[in-house]
């Protein structure tokens, strides 16, 4: 995935995967990968400069959840597109 090459991309993927799971009941990745994204965000927290970083909380990351995030329309649209792309691959 792109976030393996650029730590700032952890933020949008965490947000999209969280939205898909908690709002749309769509699990796009394995739980272990989601947990690893959370851990990578915590580990790299001080070096991440993504503009959506303020939407994240270390408390939620440590708990391995994205349940209480206020998702902006941009994230919602991207997550919906990711869900549709995933569904096309499985059909």
Q: Can you say where each PLM-predicted feature lies in the sequence?
A:
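Phosphate/adenylate-binding "loop-and-lid" substructures adjacent to NTP/NAD/dNTP-binding pockets
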Residues: 1-91
């Amino acid at each position: 995935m792109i976030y393996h090459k650029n730590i700032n991309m952890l933020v949008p993927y965490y947000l999209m995967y969280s939205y898909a799971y908690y709002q749309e009941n769509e699990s796009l990745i394995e739980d272990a990968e989601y947990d690893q994204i959370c851990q990578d965000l915590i580990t790299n927290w001080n070096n991440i400069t993504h503009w959506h970083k303020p939407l994240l909380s270390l408390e939620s990351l440590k708990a391995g959840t994205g349940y209480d995030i206020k998702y902006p329309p941009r994230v919602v649209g991207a997550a919906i597109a990711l869900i549709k792309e995933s569904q096309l691959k499985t059909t």
